[in-house]
């Protein structure tokens, strides 16, 4: 609880400033942990118009109740301000945040509150909440990204999906059986030649389900606005550093990259520290003896 409190209470703005919308039902906010490890970068959790200021990127994270949290943003003025800032500021939605950025959210099975509501309208996307929950580990690559984050094009992606819903590109005329995300791609030719998919060229990532090998397109982007269902999307390799580099170049500032390490390296260092602590606190010879005895 102390770590959550300190994370949410951070107010200082770094050379690169990332504002994460802290709705009442925020979830999976560890998606931004990788960015918190980079020097000169601030990750602030914002729940009011007054505190948003002028960030280099706005992130709409996951939500335990997308429709209720969107209604909360609509009522406190954050939605209107984010829509205004999206004209020249990068806005990135993950999972529930991605659903909010679209044109409509429909809940025919009363997964959340039932009914339907208008989205923020920043992405040509329509979401239908489903009764079945998607849970899967995925790997893949970014597609041909345009706009401010074009530097992510072709980069490797690794993460996971956990959501109730399917989102389609409402601006395309493609059969919804081949959803942008939320379902396996029916026509393998479309995987090989994504450029033949018309408006579906807006997809963020081409990802593969690590469990069954199925492939699909995930996410949508338009102008400065990007959305995806993939949690941990910035964790792979040096992707977070690439993102921060893009933000720095866009802002016209230079970061000290000498101290940067990949998030994978950072996590391994933490695991090593944990292992060292366990070894110092336990009689490891006794543990090994029990393991040897159990193996007999």
Task: Give short role names for the model-derived ranges.
Residues 45-57, 65-76:
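Glycine-rich phosphate/ribose-binding loops and adjacent secondary-structure elements
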Residues 57, 88-92, 114, 222, ...:
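Short, flexible coil/turn micro-motifs enriched in small/turn-prone residues
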Residues 174-175, 180-181, 186-187:
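Long tandem-repeat architecture
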Residues 1-44, 49-56, 122, 126-127, ...:
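C-terminal lobe/tail of nucleotide-utilizing enzymes
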Residues 63-159, 166:
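Cysteine-nucleophile active-site neighborhood
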């Amino acid at each position: 609880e102390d770590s959550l409190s300190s994370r949410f209470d951070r107010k200082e703005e770094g050379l690169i400033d990332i504002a994460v919308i802290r709705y009442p039902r925020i979830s999976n906010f560890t998606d931004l942990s990788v960015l918190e490890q980079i020097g000169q970068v601030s990750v602030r959790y914002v729940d009011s118009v007054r505190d948003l200021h002028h960030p280099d990127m706005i992130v709409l994270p996951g939500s335990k109740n997308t429709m209720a949290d969107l209604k909360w943003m609509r009522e406190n003025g954050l939605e209107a301000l984010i829509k205004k800032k999206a004209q020249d500021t990068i806005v990135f939605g993950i999972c529930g945040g991605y659903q909010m950025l679209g044109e409509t959210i429909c809940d025919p099975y009363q997964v959340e509150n039932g009914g339907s509501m208008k989205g923020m309208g920043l992405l040509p996307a329509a979401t239908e909440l489903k009764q079945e929950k998607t849970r899967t580990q995925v790997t893949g690559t970014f597609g041909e990204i345009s706009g401010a984050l074009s530097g992510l094009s072709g980069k490797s992606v690794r993460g996971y999906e956990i959501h109730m819903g399917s989102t389609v590109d409402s601006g395309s005329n493609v059969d919804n059986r081949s959803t942008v995300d939320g379902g396996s791609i029916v026509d393998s030719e479309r995987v090989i030649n994504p450029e033949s998919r018309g408006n579906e060229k807006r997809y963020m990532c081409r990802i593969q389900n690590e469990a069954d090998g199925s492939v699909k397109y995930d996410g949508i982007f338009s102008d400065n606005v990007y959305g995806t269902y993939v949690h941990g999307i910035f964790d792979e390799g040096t992707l977070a550093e690439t993102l921060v580099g893009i933000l720095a170049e866009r802002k016209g500032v230079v970061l000290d990259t000498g101290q940067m390490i990949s998030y994978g390296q950072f996590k391994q260092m933490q695991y090593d520290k944990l292992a060292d602590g366990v070894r110092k606190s336990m009689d490891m010879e006794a543990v090994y003896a029990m393991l040897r005895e159990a193996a007999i």
